């Protein structure tokens, strides 16, 4: 691979890391809203907890995909 293609691979990996930043912000916002909901209505904590765990797992898969793509771009696409 020439230097231009390697540079493009690094740019793509950097963009994938920016996507992971967005996932982290989204998970933080989701956690804040679930804590806020529990503070307002403590009786439904088990229902909110199960929904939050499911949504966090779905969100985290996006971060894992971006991380795997970044690793592949940096180490495999040489």
UniProtKB/Swiss-Prot annotation:
Record site: Reversibly protonated during proton transport: 60
Molecular functions (GO terms): lipid binding; proton-transporting ATP synthase activity, rotational mechanism
Membrane-spanning residues: 9-29, 56-76
Location in or out of the cell: Cell membrane
PROSITE patterns to which the protein is assigned, alphabetical: ATPASE_C
Keywords: ATP synthesis, Cell membrane, CF(0), Hydrogen ion transport, Ion transport, Lipid-binding, Membrane, Transmembrane, Transmembrane helix, Transport
InterPro entries: ATP_synth_csu_bac/chlpt, ATP_synth_F0_csu, ATP_synth_F0_csu_DDCD_BS, ATPase_proteolipid_c-like_dom, F/V-ATP_Csub_sf
Keyword Protein biosynthesis: no
Main location group: membrane
Membrane topology: Multi-pass membrane protein
SUPFAM superfamilies linked to this entry: F1F0 ATP synthase subunit C
Cellular component per GO, a single term: proton-transporting two-sector ATPase complex, proton-transporting domain
Subunit structure: F-type ATPases have 2 components, F(1) - the catalytic core - and F(0) - the membrane proton channel. F(1) has five subunits: alpha(3), beta(3), gamma(1), delta(1), epsilon(1). F(0) has three main subunits: a(1), b(2) and c(10-14). The alpha and beta chains form an alternating ring which encloses part of the gamma chain. F(1) is attached to F(0) by a central stalk formed by the gamma and epsilon chains, while a peripheral stalk is formed by the delta and b chains.
PANTHER family assigned: ATP SYNTHASE LIPID-BINDING PROTEIN, MITOCHONDRIAL, ATPASE PROTEIN 9
HAMAP family per UniProt: ATP_synth_c_bact
Role, per record: F(1)F(0) ATP synthase produces ATP from ADP in the presence of a proton or sodium gradient. F-type ATPases consist of two structural domains, F(1) containing the extramembraneous catalytic core and F(0) containing the membrane proton channel, linked together by a central stalk and a peripheral stalk. During catalysis, ATP synthesis in the catalytic domain of F(1) is coupled via a rotary mechanism of the central stalk subunits to proton translocation.
Family: Belongs to the ATPase C chain family.
NCBIfam families, sorted: ATP_synt_c (TIGR01260)
Name assigned to this protein: ATP synthase subunit c
Native species: Malacoplasma penetrans (strain HF-2) (Mycoplasma penetrans)
Top-level taxonomy: Bacteria, Bacillati, Mycoplasmatota, Mycoplasmoidales, Mycoplasmoidaceae
């Amino acid at each position: 691979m020439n230097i231009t293609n390697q540079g493009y691979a690094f740019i793509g990996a950097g963009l994938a890391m920016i996507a992971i930043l967005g996932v982290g912000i989204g998970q933080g916002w989701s956690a804040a809203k679930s804590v806020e909901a529990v503070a307002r209505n403590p009786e439904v904590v088990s229902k909110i907890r199960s929904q939050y765990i499911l949504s966090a797992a779905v969100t985290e898969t996006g971060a894992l995909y971006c991380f795997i793509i970044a690793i592949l771009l940096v180490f495999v696409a040489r």
